[in-house]
Amino acid sequence: MKSLKKQRRIQVIILATVALVLATGLIGYAMRDGINFFRAPSDIIAEPPQPSETFRIGGLVEDGTLVRGQGETVRFSVTDGGASVPVVFTGVLPDLFAENQGMIGTGRYVNGVFEASEILAKHDETYMPKEVMDALKEQGVYQAPES
């Protein structure tokens, strides 16, 4: 009698373990496209990512680099004070997008140019994404907003 109970308990434990491993695998598979790592321009210049890798870049839109091209194509550079990365984006920019303002872009780094598929701009004059703020502090160019 006890051996039957023990055998049933082992079967339940094995089944639960298999279900847990399967669920973890499915969650990881579903999230594979949703995970985008953040990189500062200095990180990109130091170690350029593969052209197939999608990631986020953040920093300040470099002054004097914003050029509107044909149609909705926009070119500009993003800097963290230590390095600058050229960006090309085709689409409608957020209303708050401007030079010397914080931004985060999602896309790929191909042939020395970040090809953005999405651009996010800061919310107001005091907001800056944490990753961008940390990168600017690391470069020594971050200035805290005056209250």
From Swiss-Prot:
GO molecular function list: heme binding; metal ion binding
SUPFAM superfamilies (alphabetical): Heme chaperone CcmE (SSF82093)
Keyword Ribosomal protein: no
One Pfam family from the record: CcmE
Compartments where found: Cell inner membrane
Residue intervals passing through the bilayer: 10-30
Residue spans, topological domain Periplasmic: 31-147
Keywords: Cell inner membrane, Cell membrane, Cytochrome c-type biogenesis, Heme, Iron, Membrane, Metal-binding, Signal-anchor, Transmembrane, Transmembrane helix
GO biological process: cytochrome complex assembly
Positions that bind heme: H123, Y127
Membrane topology: Single-pass type II membrane protein
Segments on the Cytoplasmic side according to the record's topology features: 1-9
Cellular component annotations (GO), alphabetically ordered: plasma membrane
Keyword hit for Cell inner membrane: yes
Function: Heme chaperone required for the biogenesis of c-type cytochromes. Transiently binds heme delivered by CcmC and transfers the heme to apo-cytochromes in a process facilitated by CcmF and CcmH.
Assigned protein family: Belongs to the CcmE/CycJ family.
Protein name as catalogued: Cytochrome c-type biogenesis protein CcmE 1
Species in which this protein is naturally found: Ruegeria pomeroyi (strain ATCC 700808 / DSM 15171 / DSS-3)
